[in-house]
């Protein structure tokens, strides 16, 4: 589980960076939950996994921080939320014995292909698995964090590289080779900085200018991305360009959001249960 921390920086640098981001035209307006299609929508340019990885990548170097050990599980959580939002999976209904989000199993709703290799591979695993598993177990299985050798087949391999290749195909990243003394490493520097800055601006606005203080009134994908970015330990990258005052406000509001009780929020009207189930799984880990 990641933690939200305060930091001290030179205000001049943060103001300069903030001004640069705000100067970019926000061409893709946030969609309201009422207009959001839970199925495959051509309006959704990036998947949640692609957005999380893009936020975690160093722009020029083209790789995530070597010290970030949270992003792998964060990406797997993003896969589950993305599948739920596309109407492919859902949590079994609550019963007297299984009320908690983490006690309820992930069930298949539709096995129709999504067009995304990682999503379809995960969908295939969920369809073939008997007995069914919980959200927390699926995150562990997809990450490969299991002691059961018979469950290792469910591990998704080379996830970051495969997501990066998708972003290359979409014109947001490029592919390079870098030499690190004893070995060569494939990296993916950001080429479309406008798209990344648009994404960062959207998250910044969601906890600043457009803050609604009620997750049920937030855009579903923005809420999911905030939860995943926090769990993947990449939110510092998003907020580091803000002035100190705005940084503190953004971090405190995000902290309040991720510290809400998932069991309570998941039962509210129009709540996306999978978002809160994934958050509950990360809070427990």
Swiss-Prot record:
GO terms for biological process: Golgi organization; Golgi to plasma membrane protein transport; Golgi vesicle budding; positive regulation of protein secretion; protein targeting to Golgi apparatus; retrograde vesicle-mediated transport, Golgi to endoplasmic reticulum. GO terms for molecular function: cargo adaptor activity; phosphatidylinositol-4-phosphate binding. The modification Phosphoserine is found at residue 112. Residues 176-187 are annotated as: Beta-hairpin required for oligomerization. It comes from the Eukaryota. It is found in: Golgi apparatus, Golgi stack membrane; Golgi apparatus, trans-Golgi network membrane. Transmembrane segments: none annotated. Belongs to the GOLPH3/VPS74 family. Homooligomer. Does not interact MYO18; differs from GOLPH3 by its inability to interact with MYO18. May interact with ARF1. PANTHER family: GOLGI PHOSPHOPROTEIN 3-LIKE (PTHR12704:SF4), TRANS-GOLGI PROTEIN GMX33 (PTHR12704). Phosphatidylinositol-4-phosphate-binding protein that may antagonize the action of GOLPH3 which is required for the process of vesicle budding at the Golgi and anterograde transport to the plasma membrane. This is Golgi phosphoprotein 3-like. The lineage of its organism: Eukaryota, Metazoa, Chordata, Craniata, Vertebrata. The gene is Golph3l.
């Amino acid at each position: 589980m990641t933690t939200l921390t305060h930091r001290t920086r030179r205000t001049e640098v943060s103001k300069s960076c903030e001004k640069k981001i705000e100067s970019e035209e926000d061409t893709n307006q946030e969609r309201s939950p009422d207009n959001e299609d839970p199925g495959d929508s051509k309006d959704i340019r990036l998947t949640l996994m692609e957005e999380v990885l893009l936020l975690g990548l160093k722009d020029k170097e083209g790789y995530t921080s070597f010290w970030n050990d949270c992003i792998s599980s964060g990406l797997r959580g993003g896969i589950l939320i993305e599948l739920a939002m596309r109407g492919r999976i859902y949590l079994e209904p609550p019963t007297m014995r299984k009320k908690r989000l983490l006690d309820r199993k992930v069930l298949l709703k539709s096995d129709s292909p999504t067009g995304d290799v990682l999503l379809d591979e995960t969908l295939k695993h969920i369809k073939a698995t008997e007995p069914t598993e919980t959200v927390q177990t699926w995150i562990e299985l997809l990450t490969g964090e299991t002691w059961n050798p018979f469950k290792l087949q469910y591990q998704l391999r080379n996830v970051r590289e495969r997501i990066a290749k998708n972003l290359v195909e979409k014109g947001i990243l490029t592919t390079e080779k870098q030499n690190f003394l004893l070995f060569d490493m494939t990296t993916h520097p950001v080429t479309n900085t406008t798209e990344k800055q648009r994404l960062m601006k959207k998250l910044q606005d969601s906890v600043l200018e457009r803050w609604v203080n009620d997750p049920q009134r937030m855009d579903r994908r923005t809420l999911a991305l905030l939860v995943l970015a926090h769990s993947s330990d990449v939110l510092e990258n998003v907020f580091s360009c803000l002035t100190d005052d705005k940084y503190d406000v953004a971090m405190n509001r995000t902290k309040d959001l991720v510290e809400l009780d998932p069991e309570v929020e998941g039962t509210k009207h129009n709540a996306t249960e999978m978002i809160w189930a994934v958050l509950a799984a990360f809070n427990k880990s």
